[in-house]
Swiss-Prot record:
Pfam families: RNA_pol_Rpb1_1, RNA_pol_Rpb1_2, RNA_pol_Rpb1_3, RNA_pol_Rpb1_4, RNA_pol_Rpb1_5. InterPro entries: DNA-dir_RpoC_beta_prime (IPR045867), DNA-dir_RpoC_beta_prime_bact (IPR012754), RNA_pol_asu (IPR000722), RNA_pol_N (IPR006592), RNA_pol_Rpb1_1 (IPR007080), RNA_pol_Rpb1_3 (IPR007066), RNA_pol_Rpb1_3_sf (IPR042102), RNA_pol_Rpb1_4 (IPR007083). It comes from Rickettsia conorii (strain ATCC VR-613 / Malish 7). Its EC number is 2.7.7.6. Zn(2+) 1 binds at residues 69, 71, 84, 87. Binds 1 Mg(2+) ion per subunit. Binds 2 Zn(2+) ions per subunit. Its cofactor is Mg(2+); Zn(2+). Belongs to the RNA polymerase beta' chain family. It comes from the Bacteria. This is DNA-directed RNA polymerase subunit beta'. GO terms for molecular function: DNA binding; DNA-directed RNA polymerase activity; magnesium ion binding; zinc ion binding. GO terms for biological process: DNA-templated transcription. Keywords: DNA-directed RNA polymerase, Magnesium, Metal-binding, Nucleotidyltransferase, Transcription, Transferase, Zinc. Mg(2+) binds at residues 460, 462, 464.
Amino acid sequence: MSVVNFYGQLSNTQQFDQIRINIASPDQVRSWSFGEVTKPETINYRTFKPEKDGLFCARIFGPVKDYECLCGKYKRMKNRGITCEKCGVEVTVSRVRRERMGHIELAAPVAHIWFLKSLPSRISTLLDMTMRDVEKILYFENYVVVDPGLSILQKGELLTEEELQKAKDKYGEDAFTASIGAEVIQQMLKELDFSKLKQELYEELQTTSSEVKKKKLVKRLKLVENFLESENKPEWMIMDVLPVIPPEIRPLVMLDGGRFATSDLNELYRRVINRNNRLKKLIESKAPDIIVRNEKRMLQEAVDALFDNGRRGRAAKNANKRPFKSLSDMLKGKQGRFRQNLLGKRVDYSGRSVIVVGPELKLHQCGLPKKMALELFKPFIYSKLELYGIATTIKAAKRMVEAEKSEVWDVLEEVIREHPVLLNRAPTLHRLGIQAFEPLLIEGKAIQLHPLVCAAFNADFDGDQMAVHIPLSIEAQLEARVFMMSTNNILSPANGRPIIVPDKDIVLGLYYLTLAFDNEVGAGMMFSDLAEMEHALYNKFITIHTKIKYRRNQLNAEGKMVPVIIDTTYGRLMVGELLPSNPNIEFKCINKQLTKKDISLVIDLVYRHCGQKATVIFADQLMKLGFKYACSSGISFGMDDMVVPESKSTHINETQLEIKEFEQQYSNGLITYGEKYNKVVDAWSRCTDRVANDMMKEIATPPVNDAPNHQKINAIYMMAISGARGSFQQIKQLGGMRGLMTKSNGQIIQTPIISNFKEGLTEFECFNSANGMRKGQIDTALKTASSGYLTRKLVDVAQDCIITEKDCGTDKGIEVKSVIEGGEVIVPLAEKILGRTAAIDIFHPVTNDLILNKGELINEAKLEQIESAGFDRIMIKSVLTCESTTGICSICYGRDLATGTLVSEGEAIGVIAAQSIGEPGTQLTMRTFHIGGAATKGAEVSSVDASYDAKVKIISRNVVINSEERKIVMSRNCELLLLDNNGNEKARHKIPYGARLLVDDGDMVIKTQKLAEWDPYTIPIITEKSGKVLFKDMVEGISIRDVTDEATGIPSKVIIESKQYSRGAELRPRIQLLDAKGEVITLSNGLEARYYLPVGAVLSVEDGVQISVGDIIARIPKESTTTKDITGGLPRVAELVEARRPKDHAVIAEIDGRVEFGKDYKSKRRIIIHPIDETMSIEYMVPKGKHVVVNEGDFVKKGDLLIDGNPVLQDILKVMGVEVLANYIVNEVQAVYRLQGVKIDDKHIEVIIRQMLQKVEVTDSGGTTLLVGEKIDRHEFDEINEKAMKNGLKPAEAQLILQGITKASLQTRSFISAASFQETTRVLTEAAIAGKVDKLRGLKENVIVGRLVPAGTGYFMDKMRKAAAKLDEENV
């Protein structure tokens, strides 16, 4: 026997490549078993020894103590392998009690509840019965006809007890066979001939036309094919023998006081054994049928409870009325086997303690309490003590450590040197939540943390705790040092910006240090070296803020030192001294008042040009400098620093007058209540902003008096402007006015809070503000959970996304352009393409020089070239178009944001993407507008101004001139472009229907010139011709109603939803225009002038009046159209990645064509689009009350909205394709994060979208075995098609489908990963029937089977292992 096998078998976890799951056959169960369990007893309560043949029997499951049989005849190692003849126990290690199984021979067959009740029920699908019927047979309620024989009964017909008796009386006892219970189901399953059944189903599928029937057939056919492929037998779903899991896995523990705590499984097994034994006795003693049947039913129920308690009927409960935990419950949920023990293990060699700040640490260090280090590094200390001969044995070493002798501390110092430890702060939302540091031993009991890493850990020192873990093996230490050291994690993987950035007081100190004042002592002095300046400072000739001239040596591009004279201050020079010398880093980047943003940019610059080491040193020194001056400046603030502006009362009075006017308009019936509400809220928003701006001006300009200069600047202003603490939002509430508050449902209360915190709130205001504050508090508590859940879903869907090759060689890419909203460039092109790779060769548009090769990385240098060339769009490679079969290639992904270089193979980009999107999720409030409940609703946009001097170009211009000689836009998709001198687009504005155009095509405009204006609160309906108004289908009280406003008593005519009219005709309220002869006027597009009015429209004209071109005949109040709920923050992100249908979604035109309104149907309107080439027209049925944004006769383009709202993602994919869809999702998700000022790189969102687009739906099966409507993995589909084409068959056709992330996770190729995510039982049931094979490609499945993950270093281990296996095969 080899030495290796001496202590039992080595774990063979490394030996397999894939795992397969199947239904166990009865013979297999018997082969696993070491004996039959026949007695329900567990252990003898007097001797505490396991009972023979019971649930803990030592003969079946193995000895209780190592190498000792039960009766004690054989003890110790020498008797290994002997089976005791007295008690029948094999002498071996007690560990076998964790792996040996037993079995129970059932007296009657029993159905496995998973295959019966897990939807869709497999047993009933195969037998083509309903689940209800199968249950009736199994639970002995009805008989089923197995063989109709001579009767006219149908095979498979159900009969009750009475019906059976009648049939027997009618046809005779033996004329037919009917039976009951699991036996008959087993027999029916056995009789199924799958190959024949498959053929029949195929034929039926070809002939049937009913969709419902097709779906049912496809389902059944799929199941039949699964059984054929997996070689499972259907009768195995009914069990004759039940496995008993090893006793150590369902332990029985003795508590103090002689009582026992037992696993629920033992209780459930006992019930099964008891009922089984009773059934055996009843059968032997030939008991009456009805009693036997009842016992069989009870046995079935007992086995059901064991497998999945509570799935059917009432759950079996214990004495405390708590349901038993069955086998299924052991796997399910957060506390189940998968998530509790396989994915989340407790870690040895770890400790946790409170953290305190360690400002004198270096960036790569942390302070570790001595006591803690002694405990954590014990094994290392023991070995060192023994090695040096200080202790003779391990035991002696242990005693020394316990006595804390002085030698021990010396050894500890040595052990700890250069041995990194991992620090982790829960919740670990992204990979920077665990970082490695070199420990320094400190007194006390708290861990010291470097201030600069707080941002990454999201830590503060108000009592946070952190955990310490020790990497033991040399490999682990190496990985900790190379990958996880805090100095190697300077850039954030989410956006590639530095995350080691000074914060809070450091920023304040640096801001104070770099201030410059005009009339300070010694202004304008000249200096040539720092020592001289220090001398002057010490003797009070200058201050740190004095503006002086200084001669500084600067590196030029050739690397020579060149003296330059600069205007600066002593404070700025101190920061300048820390800058590494590099020609690209000029003094001017810090020669200004440094805010947090500036500091971040400087650190980024240093990292890009001088590398990591220089950055770390620079950041560390910057921190020390910042702390020093934050301390010596003594900045603090008092009541007088909160300035209330003089102009506050005037602004408030003006606004109150304005609001009186709105009230007047409302009482005169000129505007609706909703419009009044909008206008009031808007007016107050504007007022608040004005007061705030005035206050800011006052704070920013120091008062002119004789106080020494550096006390002039306002402390609160300094804190906010430098980015150290607080925001202008908060200052506004301190000194301006608090403004509008939101109700708990997100509505804005019309009366604002006029006071600020300095003046104090009135009782009424205080009560009003409590509302919003309470909502904020509750939100915070609730949102954390939903954010965590979103992160978990994202990680799960993307966890197998790994970089597997350098280049997939695809020619595809996506086109990106800058994001423009409201004519402003929000995200410039440069930001979107940095760190991506070019999909094609890119040439300069003027000189035609090659700027970028295909597949070349776009770095900062290339970016400058692209920007100067003036591109407005660029083709880049993307993970969406990557063609790697497993994983993704480096070139399509581009730059690894955490390192700034091309991503390396083995990087787990999926998890990084999920973390990058999920981590800021916790910062996203549910609703996006509270600062202490204050509403920050932006005023509605009601006009467009030119942002540049430019030339106007108007797209789809359709204008009428109204009676006031104004140009009124009549087009639904009018866009106004501003072009520069070269004709490049600088800005693009959407001009709404009904707006007044103030410029025309080809005009030259100057900056800030108004281009167009409109009423933001209503959508008008405007006439294109003059004529006389004729009302049609406007029946008082049925389709139109005089709505009298209760506040004003003024009636206005409003269109209401018309119920079915008495004569059954549908009413379609409309206004027609008649000419002088009384005939309907024809419009320019050849249609009659009639305007359909949606529900809620308010009429602006009377019947029979004369109107002119461009007049408003009705208006739709905006509030009824903006039911586009502002699903803010996280719910919107979740809605997008789950691909849900938005509430009140938009309808998209699928083709280009002309719009026509067809005949209405019930409560739906029919919109028809006729394509230009007069092929098939497309019809849409839309609910009547919805506002249709097109008119009859309008020409729409593919992808235009017919009805307002958020479009359905699946529609975008179907109509516009993948690229447009991806673009839409990326922009929508980014919009949510942008509101919060969170930056995430697009590529992370693209990775998630790629995972949502994994499946295709078969539309034509061709010559393959695929079924129409089947959903299958893209790559599998391609493989099947390749095979078909090789064999000369017609390939199948399919279309891409978009799945939400939950669905995509549950349908991954790996069943282990899917089972550990959600719906464990359903996933495992499906996998077992199909005999699925898990190739162990993703991270999760490998963690579960206990291997290194195939990412990072594990990726190469995996690659080498596979290569080695291949070589072995070849050699053999």
